[in-house]
């Protein structure tokens, strides 16, 4: 059963943070790549700390072993210096899919007994 095996590693490009550059009077989009470097199929979901300012497309999906997906992280226009951006980040959550399951995202796979792993990517805003 896949749920008893801890999920393997993923890689992200960039690996540690996402950087947006001023001006912030228009929407910015930054692409990141998520790679399933494990030997099992995983399901992933992306969370943001500021849903008003940050968006991710696609926000969830399923990746086969060694498969990658390109995500568009968007930052809507905002008043730089007048809003708190210190804690902005996106979090990639992932877990193994059950053995024999269809390659289709299911939210309940995150709510079962299996381990869910997380990787935080802080957002840096350059003035």
From Swiss-Prot:
It is found in: Cell projection, Pseudopodium; Cytoplasm, Cytoskeleton. It comes from the Eukaryota. InterPro entries: Ig-like_fold, MSP_dom, Nematode_MSP, PapD-like_sf. The keyword Acetylation applies. This is Major sperm protein 55/57. Sperm. The modification N-acetylalanine is found at residue 2. Central component in molecular interactions underlying sperm crawling. Forms an extensive filament system that extends from sperm villipoda, along the leading edge of the pseudopod. Residues 9-126 form the MSP domain. One of its GO terms (cellular component) is cytoplasm. Keywords: Acetylation, Cell projection, Cytoplasm, Cytoskeleton. Around 30 MSP isoforms may exist in C.elegans. PANTHER family: MAJOR SPERM PROTEIN, MSP DOMAIN-CONTAINING PROTEIN-RELATED. Pfam families: Motile_Sperm.
């Amino acid at each position: 059963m896949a749920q008893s095996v801890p999920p393997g590693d993923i890689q992200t490009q960039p690996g540690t943070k996402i950087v947006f550059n001023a001006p912030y009077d228009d929407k910015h989009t930054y692409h990141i790549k998520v790679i399933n470097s494990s030997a099992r199929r995983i399901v992933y979901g992306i969370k943001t700390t500021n849903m008003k300012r940050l968006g991710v497309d696609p926000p969830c999906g399923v990746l086969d072993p060694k498969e990658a997906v390109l995500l568009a992280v968007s930052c809507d226009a905002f008043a730089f210096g007048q809003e708190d951006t210190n804690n902005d980040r996106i979090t990639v959550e992932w877990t193994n899919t059950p053995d024999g399951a269809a390659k289709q995202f299911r939210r309940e796979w995150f709510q079962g007994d299996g381990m869910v792993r997380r990787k935080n990517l802080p957002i840096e805003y350059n003035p």
